[in-house]
Design a protein with these regions (language model features):
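Conserved hydrophobic alpha-helix
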Residues: 73, 123-127
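Conserved structural core of kinase catalytic domains
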Residues: 59-63, 74, 78-120
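C-lobe/activation-segment region of protein kinase-like
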Residues: 151-227
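Catalytic-loop of the protein kinase fold
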Residues: 129-139
């Protein structure tokens, strides 16, 4: 059952609406409070071009995976939003707000710390060692808080127990973003990969960092060839 105040936009317990922060093709994101805590509400949009039953099943499946990923990471103290509430019927999810700036803005403003990209690589490896791939790892979905801690956000395309290809693809998505949007930082992806390898530990059933970076190189070369 939906808690009162979720969809109304009227301040009310447990969700108190403040402002809309993003209107995208996939979802509408609003800022507010959940039981007095700073929170973000993501409401997934139906796809008009899709069969309604199929769209509903796909949306529920994606939301279930996103919720599972966030819950898993939360239990393991991974730097990502905390999961507050999920409503599969209304296609919405409420998570904690991460204060700070997207890596995109930090890099655009020229305020990137010397070891930041290496630490980003370490966070990505830590994500993978927790059995999760991100699926949309751009500099908009990497946050740096006021203390300099790095967080990953927006797990709408995440996978649980991902295959090697998914892990390599995470690095490739970030590589494409760095190349297209941050060309003023040459060699950025190499710093990320260095941090990815440096953080690596041996985890059962998780491909080691060498295999992942090798697959990333294969994907990158494949894209260059096709391009």
């Amino acid at each position: 059952m939906r808690p009162p105040g979720i969809m109304s936009g009227v301040p009310y317990r447990p969700w108190s609406f403040e402002t809309k922060v993003h209107e995208g093709a996939e979802a509408t994101v609003s800022k507010g409070e959940w039981l007095g805590k700073p929170a973000m509400l993501k409401l997934r949009k139906p796809k008009g071009y899709r069969n309604p039953d199929l769209d509903n099943r796909l949306t529920k499946s994606r939301m279930a995976v996103e919720a599972r990923a966030l819950s898993r990471l939360q239990k393991r103290n991974f730097p990502s939003p905390s999961l507050f509430y999920v409503d599969h019927q209304d296609s919405l999810i409420i998570i904690s707000e991460i204060e700070g700036l997207p890596l995109f803005e930090v890099m655009a403003n020229g305020n990137l710390g010397e070891d930041a990209l290496s630490r980003v690589g370490g966070i990505i490896r830590r994500l993978h060692e927790n059995g999760v791939s991100h699926g949309d790892l751009t500099t908009h979905n990497i946050m740096i808080d006021p203390s300099g801690e790095i967080f990953l956000i927006d797990f709408g395309l995440a996978k649980i127990s991902p295959e090697l290809e998914n892990l390599g693809q995470d690095l490739q998505v970030l590589n494409e973003c760095l190349t297209a949007s941050h060309s003023e930082y040459p060699g950025a992806i190499e710093k990320v990969v260095s941090g990815y390898i440096s953080f690596s530990t041996s985890v059962p059933d998780v491909p080691d960092s060498g295999d992942v970076t090798l697959r990333f190189d294969e994907i990158r070369n494949r894209v260059r060839y096709l391009g």
